[in-house]
Curated annotation (Swiss-Prot):
GO cellular component entries: chloroplast; ribonucleoprotein complex; ribosome
Keywords in alphabetical order: Chloroplast, Plastid, Ribonucleoprotein, Ribosomal protein, RNA-binding, rRNA-binding
Organism: Amborella trichopoda
Top-rank lineage group of the source organism: Eukaryota
Name by which UniProt lists this protein: Small ribosomal subunit protein uS11c
InterPro entries associated with the record: Ribosomal_uS11, Ribosomal_uS11_bac-type, Ribosomal_uS11_CS, Ribosomal_uS11_sf
Oligomeric form and interacting partners: Part of the 30S ribosomal subunit.
Biological process annotations from GO: translation
Length: 138
């Protein structure tokens, strides 16, 4: 029986080089997605490849505590700690969503020692798109 020739870089034989190896990242983009239920902080390089991420849920907060400002602050601190060790000095911040953790995450990012180029609010706003859900009657 003929042996199959392994394709280089195929999904079956794994990735050739790990994306999360210790490369030096001088500049990056920090994405903060703050919903009412959770806060997700993702750190990418300039090309958009994910270097590090953390959410309030992965930090150990469960239930309604995930949406608190303290949980967002902890998630931002954990996500940035790894990239500061990899040498990130400058970053751009993109904040999305209406959650309570927006300001707390930004405060934690400012305290981390990374110089911020700019802070941009990228919350999606409809130009009167879909009909919103009906009002809650409690």
């Amino acid at each position: 029986m003929k042996k199959p020739i392994p394709r280089i870089g195929s999904r079956r034989n794994g990735r050739i080089g790990s994306r999360k190896n210790g490369r030096r990242i001088p500049k990056g983009v920090i994405h903060v997605q703050a919903s009412f239920n959770n806060t997700i902080v993702t750190v990418t390089d300039v090309r958009g490849r994910v270097v590090s991420w953390c959410s309030a849920g992965t930090c150990g907060f469960r239930g309604t505590r995930r949406g608190t400002p303290f949980a967002a602050q902890t998630a931002a601190t954990n996500a940035i700690r790894t990239v500061v060790d990899q040498g990130m000095q400058r970053a751009e911040v993109m904040i999305k969503g209406p959650g309570l953790g927006r300001d707390a995450a930004l405060r934690a990012i400012r305290r981390s020692g990374v110089l911020l180029s700019f802070v941009r609010d990228v919350t999606p706003m409809p130009h009167n798109g879909c009909r919103p859900p009906k009002k809650r009657r409690v």
